[in-house]
Swiss-Prot record:
It comes from Vaccinia virus (strain Western Reserve). The keyword tRNA processing does not apply. Residues 1-27 are annotated as: Disordered. Residues 1-10 have a biased composition (Basic residues). Keywords: Early protein. Induction: Expressed in the early phase of the viral replicative cycle. This is Protein OPG052. Residues 11-21 have a biased composition (Basic and acidic residues).
Length: 65
């Protein structure tokens, strides 16, 4: 049990160190390896509202001329 606690603490310390380090832009090899995952970001409330509006905007048909 004591060993598992120690492992958890070291993992948390590693995450804190990663947050402190400035993020470098991904190299071409990393982009080729991981693809779109670099562009994935957390949604803010505003972005979520915009995302929810898309189906209504797309389904809107302009009146025929």
């Amino acid at each position: 049990m004591e060993g598992s606690k120690r492992k958890h603490d070291s993992r948390r310390l590693q995450q804190e160190q990663e947050q402190l380090r400035p993020r470098t832009p991904p190299s071409y090899e990393e982009i080729a390896k991981y693809g779109h995952s670099f562009n994935v970001k957390r949604f803010t409330n505003e972005e979520m509202c915009l995302k929810n509006d898309y189906p209504r905007i797309i389904s809107y048909n302009p009146p025929p001329k």
